[in-house]
Amino acid sequence: MGGRKRNVRKMALAVIGIAGIVLACYFLLVNFLVSAALVPSFMKRLQAFERITNEGYAAQVQTEDIQENGRAALEGTKEWLKTVQRQKVSIQSEDGFTLVAELFPRTDNHRWVILLHGYTGWKEELYPFAYWYHEEGYQVLAPDLRCQGESEGDFIGMGWTDHYDCLLWIQYILSLDEEAEIVLHGQSMGAATALMVTGEEALPSNVKAVISDCAYTDAYSMFGEKIKEWFGLPSFPFVDSACLALRLRGGYNLKDASALEAVTKSRTPTLFIHGEQDAMISVGMSRELYEAAAWQKELLIVENAGHAQSQDKDPDTYYGTIRVFLDKTLAKQE
């Protein structure tokens, strides 16, 4: 009898030990997923940036007109950068990180634009937009989002921590120009960031409009898609577990990073733009955001454009639509 009890006890301890090992391996895997997607230093060791670059290229439409227009925009931007006045500026985030931006000032009016880049991007990617806005008479602020480019950070914010940082950049502009009329123009994750900003009750009335180019509806859905695509793992239970790990390690929850929820509360006029053939963020997401938006809104779908390519596929329509939308919106609020 005593021997049987000892055997049962040994079996129970063995089961507990195996369960503990499985659980530990599971949480190691979950933490690996978080680091592989959101920690640039870890991503670099995994050569994840090369994978993301290749994925981004695959999500684009490679046609001669897009490539030609893109090259022309870059050449024009290079010439502009040789002579334009600019300066590097920085602020501190609420959690103590130094955030860096490039400022392109003007002195002839109070119109401003904040340019917000995408996932694993940097401010220089949006300099062609800075060139266009500056020529249109806007003062331009182009930040590196946290943990990217020259800005410090521990985790990529997927728009959530970034939108709090953007609120600080807005306050920075207001410290320079109390009468500033501010436009937020974001691409991809930067667009989702801009939309999340407008969902804040404390948003200063100086923020007059948003240009949302190829935004996703929410980071939770995007993370689930990428886990499946990159690692062949199902969303459940890994995404929820990753949310818990990120909350413990990074201080935020992916479920909070919802542009879709923000637009239902927004009182900021918004122009939604998306490439019809975007293979990275479905055009359906911008349509969903547009339908959910509760305030003045417009939607531009650019045919035969891939991810973040609308401006190169049809620059006249892209920038012309933005110009008309902003002139109308800003004039209405003056």
What role is predicted for each listed range?
Residues 305-319:
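Catalytic histidine-centered segment of alpha/beta-hydrolase-like enzymes
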Residues 196-253, 301:
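Hydrolase active-site cap/lid region
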Residues 259, 268, 282-291:
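Short alpha-helix in the alpha/beta-hydrolase fold that links the catalytic acid
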Residues 265-267, 272-274, 278:
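Short beta-strand/loop motif that positions the catalytic acidic residue
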Residues 132-152:
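Conserved alpha/beta-hydrolase
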Residues 24-92:
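An N-terminal hydrophobic leader/cap segment in hydrolases
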Residues 119-132, 145:
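The serine-hydrolase catalytic nucleophile loop
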Residues 125, 156-177:
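Alpha/beta-hydrolase active-site loop
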